[in-house]
């Protein structure tokens, strides 16, 4: 196998591939035109975050079998285009976890003790001991937003500094947090109770602007804010105003809304803002780890062995691939619906495969369901390979069973998801390549889960659906389809309504819908 290393990775990773018989060529710093010209020669390519492997590059890569991203985020790779070409995309989750966690702690200490400012002062020939009075972290309360891999390691290190640690993560169990003596609280409690707030969530549609003007107003006076996750999660304009108003005593940032930040960014002009140029993962150890993780997967691919960190394709017997793929899609869609509807820490997942489906290797059906459950909160950090280990990490109980025969259908997939005392049931099947959800809880629905859906419970009485239609019409939202399921044959109970809309509703419209007479709840999910 011929491998193109398009961005710097560790020499150890390059040597490992060569020792395993791969022909490796290192060509860093290529222009886009050079990459398109060179890539047809290779069966594997390794990139980091700068090289864009988009549809045009993939189209040019006639012989490409695998794309390795030496890092976690895959925003620079067109996953759909790669999948359509049968190209496996692998990344390196966890390879830079410790480095990122340590950097967050370093930023926290630097802000608390004003280390960069004091360093600059001494180098200017000054001796301003009183000016740089700091605070101890011992005994203070750290608020960790996001208790995934990095957040978990940050919380452990805060405990080692003898801090009290609160965490907000609606998708992590209380038992998981208690393993390291961390108390799970709601978002507002964390904001109001923390002396230091550190952010460790991925950048998704839901987390952009997670900490804005309203959230700063709920914080303690004199709070320290640290962001070593992704730019845009902390609203920079709101942060600037909070610092100027004295609400925030100091901030420490490794990531920015625009990178590199503009020299005119007002945060860069504040003396109590510590900044670094997105280097949380830039350690020798992290680069060795991510390089080796990618190198091992490329070697496995060359030897015909399973890869460990595939982002896009599971390992399924070629003869079963066409039959299984729609069920993987169905399971993932079910997971997304359950995640959005339940909206809390998942405790238990049960999967039952019946009929012809039960005769296949259904391991990836469960993994696809878990991927769907986690995707709304973990974004590109989750894939079919990592989904099950992440579930185990989070203390989720997984039960899998098979039933040989089933009535009415060739195959049936049933899932039960439990969260904070609530349970959701979904059942579905596939007809060729078409996947359909047949039942949600006690409601018969039968629909194709694809597009923008609003799922709502409402009282079964005249006028409710009409009021929803009026609201949507007033807000120029077109309803493309509607399914209403009753819990029984008689009117007067509770109905489940599925609305397929052409465009996603704004949060304001969704909130207004929940206030309509007869509406019990409403959630939006993109399927």
Curated annotation (Swiss-Prot):
Binding-site residues for NAD(+), renumbered to this chain: 149-150, 169, 228-230, 254, 278-281
ACT domain location: 453-527
Oxidoreductase found in the keyword field: yes
Enzyme class: oxidoreductase
Pathway membership, UniProt: Amino-acid biosynthesis; L-serine biosynthesis; L-serine from 3-phospho-D-glycerate: step 1/3
Pfam family, one: 2-Hacid_dh_C
Keyword flag Amino-acid biosynthesis: yes
EC number: 1.1.1.95
UniProt protein name: D-3-phosphoglycerate dehydrogenase
Naturally occurring in which organism (per UniProt): Archaeoglobus fulgidus (strain ATCC 49558 / DSM 4304 / JCM 9628 / NBRC 100126 / VC-16)
Gene (name only): serA
């Amino acid at each position: 196998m011929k491998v193109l290393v398009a961005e710097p990775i560790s020499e150890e990773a390059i040597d490992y591939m060569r020792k395993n018989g791969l022909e490796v060529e290192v060509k860093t710093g290529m222009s886009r035109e050079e990459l398109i010209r060179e890539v047809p020669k290779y069966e594997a390519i390794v990139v980091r975050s700068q090289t864009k492997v988009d549809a045009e590059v993939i189209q040019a890569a006639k012989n490409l079998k695998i794309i390795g991203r030496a890092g976690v985020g895959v925003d620079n790779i067109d996953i759909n285009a790669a999948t359509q070409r049968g190209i496996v995309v692998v990344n390196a989750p966890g390879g830079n976890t410790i480095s990122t966690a340590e950097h967050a702690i370093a930023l926290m200490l630097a802000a608390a003790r004003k280390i960069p400012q004091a360093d600059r002062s001494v180098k200017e020939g000054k001796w301003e001991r009183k000016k740089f009075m700091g605070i101890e972290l011992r005994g203070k309360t750290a608020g960790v937003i996001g208790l995934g891999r990095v957040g978990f390691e940050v919380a452990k290190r805060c405990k080692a500094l003898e801090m009290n640690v609160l965490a907000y993560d609606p998708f992590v169990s209380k038992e998981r947090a208690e393993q390291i003596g961390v108390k799970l609280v709601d978002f507002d409690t964390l904001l109001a109770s923390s002396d230091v707030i550190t952010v460790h969530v991925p950048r998704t549609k839901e987390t952009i602007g997670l900490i804005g003007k309203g959230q700063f107003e709920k914080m303690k006076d004199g709070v320290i804010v640290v962001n070593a996750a992704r730019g845009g999660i902390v609203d920079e304009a709101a942060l600037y105003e909070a610092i100027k108003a004295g609400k925030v005593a100091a901030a420490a940032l490794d990531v920015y809304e625009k990178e590199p930040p503009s020299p005119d960014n007002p945060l860069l002009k504040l003396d109590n803002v510590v900044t670094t140029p997105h280097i949380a993962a830039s350690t020798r150890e992290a680069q060795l780890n991510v390089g080796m993780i990618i190198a091992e997967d490329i070697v496995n691919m060359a030897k015909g062995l399973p890869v460990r960190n595939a982002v896009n394709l599971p390992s399924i017997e070629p003869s079963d691939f066409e039959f299984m793929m729609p069920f993987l899609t169905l399971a993932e869609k079910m997971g997304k619906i359950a995640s959005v509807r339940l909206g809390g820490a998942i405790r238990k997942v049960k999967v039952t495969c019946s009929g012809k489906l039960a005769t296949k290797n259904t391991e990836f059906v469960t993994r696809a369901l878990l991927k769907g459950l986690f995707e709304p909160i973990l974004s590109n950090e989750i894939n079919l390979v990592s989904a099950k280990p992440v579930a185990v990490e989070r203390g989720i109980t997984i039960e899998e069973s098979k039933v040989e025969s089933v009535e009415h259908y060739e195959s049936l997939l049933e899932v039960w998801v439990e969260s904070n005392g609530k349970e959701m049931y979904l059942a579905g099947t596939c007809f060729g390549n078409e996947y359909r959800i047949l039942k949600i809880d006690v409601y018969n629905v039968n629909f194709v889960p694809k597009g923008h859906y609003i799922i709502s419970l409402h009282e079964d009485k005249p006028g409710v659906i009409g009021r929803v239609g009026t609201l949507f019409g007033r807000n120029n939202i077109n309803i493309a389809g509607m399914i209403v399921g009753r819990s029984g044959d008689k009117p007067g109970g509770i109905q489940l309504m599925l609305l397929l809309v052409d465009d996603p509703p704004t949060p304001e419209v969704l909130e207004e819908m929940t206030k309509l007479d007869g509406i019990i709840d409403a959630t939006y999910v993109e399927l």
